[in-house]
Amino acid sequence: MKMNMFTAILALCLLFAAVIACSGTETSDSSVSSLTTPSISEGTESPADRRSDSPIEIPESTVTIDPTLAKPITDVSGRNSEVMDEATKTQPDAPVVLAWPEDVGSNHFGKLGDDISGWEGGWIRPHAGRFIWGLIEPKAGEYDWKFTTDKRVERWQDENLAVLVTIWPFATWDQDSCNHDKPEAIGAFPGMGTHLYYPCNEEAYIDWLTAVVERYDGDGIDDMPGLKYPIRHWEVLNEPEMQGPKLTFYQEDSQSYLKLLKVSYRAIKSADSESVVLSGGQAGMQSKFVDYWQPILRGASGYFDLGNIHSISSSDLDFFASEYRDFLDENGFGSTEFWVTEALVGTPPREQKLSEDQLARRTMTGYASSFAAGADIIFNVGGHDPTGGPGSLSEKTVEVMAQTLGDFIGVSPLDENLIEFEMPSGSTVFVLWDNAVLPPSVSGEVTVIDYLGNENIEEAIEVSGSSPRMIIVGPRP
């Protein structure tokens, strides 16, 4: 307040000095000091008289201002320019939108679990993962991010992993409010509780799911601190049709899951319009699973972006990809792509146990055939399976395939045992087995990599699929 009064007095003094200078009146000094009040000679007009006339133009050279006392210029609103600059500095910056890195999720191979090694650009599908309603929101309205999901996301992003997140819509405090007297689930994952029904408080579930997607969508608004790139892919539950005596993921019928899918889809898209929503993984193409999913697909148009199928130790060569493609087509999803989010190569039911070498052979033919039938991403279950999986040889086969053709940009089945993969480098990779041979158009030396990763150079005309192998024509990808 004192500084403002001093400034006003100083301005008045300067005005007096300027008026006298313009009228030619003599003062005691040749120049007017900013600290001296000028005297007014007799017979001259007073400053008050001057103020009644038109504005006075003050020559710049007339007034000398002590620079140590000069005040910053003010704008037309009277605000100090320095204050304006400071206000501008403190205005919040526009949200920084994070881009999806080109090297994240560039591979068509993924793995069930929380980490991956052996190839770059791969996908993970944590199972069950940490995106459980009651784990993140242990009490209504109270969120715990840091030690449930943030730490995991930080680690995934330090390793440049693409993630498919499974959403679990269960919180014990919610289920207890309306489902406490219903049968309990058997074999549920830890952290989910024992009642796995449709949320009692739908609005609370929507609020939670919206907050989850918002925290990791990378739009610069309410994001996780330190987020490097968005999480975009969300799967609504897992195998909801699995309701057996040993394993249960959901305790409701098809119509209930359809309702859950619709509600979840809207919530996810409201937080992130660029998100990709997958239906919960269909456990297989066996009739009991098809019967559960048929009415869902008939009512789910516009409520999922990618189909989702599983194949666990089935006798189906291509992990149900062909059958599932037909299933989607028949139910109005002809243009919808799909992923195989669980692929376990194992001995099919009622068949003689296969050796590790046989399982490794099936691994190469299964992945190649599934991609050829339309699968876009395939997640290897491998050792994540409670049985231990098909063994280290099969794991090696998946790794070699991911390294060699994982970033393919096109795939074409040329025969039932000959598949062509187009690579971004311009090279071509063929996968062949059961004594298949290369097309006649291929000649010269080619690189041959068998299902165990053994590599050599051969003449194209001499190559045959006596065992499953990949043939690289052109520069190695």
Q: What residue spans do the PLM features occupy?
A:
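Active-site cleft segment of glycoside hydrolase catalytic domains centered on the general acid/base Glu
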Residues: 179-304, 311-327, 331, 348-365, ...
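Aromatic- and carboxylate-lined catalytic core of secreted/periplasmic carbohydrate-active enzymes
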Residues: 360, 364-439, 452-455, 464-470
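Conserved, mostly hydrophobic/aromatic
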Residues: 156, 212, 234, 264, ...
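Bacterial N-terminal signal peptides that target proteins for export
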Residues: 1-9
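N-terminal substrate-binding region of glycoside hydrolase catalytic domains
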Residues: 83-231, 235, 241, 245-247
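Structural recognition of the beta-strand scaffold that forms the well-ordered cores
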Residues: 103-108, 122-132, 162-167, 232-236, ...
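Ser/Thr-rich, Proline-interspersed low-complexity disordered segments
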Residues: 22-95
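Bacterial N-terminal signal peptides
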Residues: 9-19
